[in-house]
Amino acid sequence: MPDTMLPACFLGLLAFSSACYFQNCPRGGKRAMSDLELRQCLPCGPGGKGRCFGPSICCADELGCFVGTAEALRCQEENYLPSPCQSGQKACGSGGRCAAFGVCCNDESCVTEPECREGFHRRARASDRSNATQLDGPAGALLLRLVQLAGAPEPFEPAQPDAY
């Protein structure tokens, strides 16, 4: 009986202890996470102009948000980094941060949020002027034509009577 008592006591102590036994625990233990400073999340999107807001969300001030697209693929790397990050200028909604003009994102989704329109006006207007010069010439003409075609109503063709 004493031979089985020692292993049983050891297993009991092991079960009731609260240490980190898994590899995914933060350095310094469970309570060390509050001591870490938040870093800025990874850059993403076209030209690295955006920031990750979740594993499949990439937002940029002048581009808006990409959710579940190729532009947001880099954001999946954030899951493998040991330190927490935070993007966005100010808190909004339920646990989100302002991501772009009028858009509030958390790590799972984005919603329109009127309080996120403040602080983006000047940047959005300045970028409108700079983006217009980037599309001068044939590329700009092609893009303009595609937008016009997409917005044009389709021609109405009367239905042909069925012939037997």
Curated annotation (Swiss-Prot):
Changing C116G: In NDI; strong accumulation in the endoplasmic reticulum and an altered morphology of this organelle. InterPro entries: Neurhyp_horm, Neurhyp_horm_dom_sf, Neurohypophysial_hormone_CS. The record marks G28 as: Important for agonist activity on V1aR/AVPR1A. Glycans are attached at N131. PROSITE patterns: NEUROHYPOPHYS_HORM. SMART domains: NH. Disulfide bonds join C20-C25, C41-C85, C44-C58, C52-C75, C59-C65, C92-C104, C98-C116, C105-C110. Pfam families: Hormone_4 (PF00220), Hormone_5 (PF00184). One of its GO terms (biological process) is water transport. GO terms for cellular component: clathrin-coated endocytic vesicle membrane; cytosol; dendrite; extracellular region; extracellular space; neuronal dense core vesicle; secretory granule. Residues 1-19 form the signal peptide. PANTHER family: NEUROPHYSIN, VASOPRESSIN-NEUROPHYSIN 2-COPEPTIN. Belongs to the vasopressin/oxytocin family. Interacts with vasopressin receptors V1bR/AVPR1B (Ki=85 pM), V1aR/AVPR1A (Ki=0.6 nM) and V2R/AVPR2 (Ki=4.9 nM). Interacts with oxytocin receptor (OXTR) (Ki=110 nM). This is Vasopressin-neurophysin 2-copeptin. It comes from Homo sapiens. The gene is AVP.
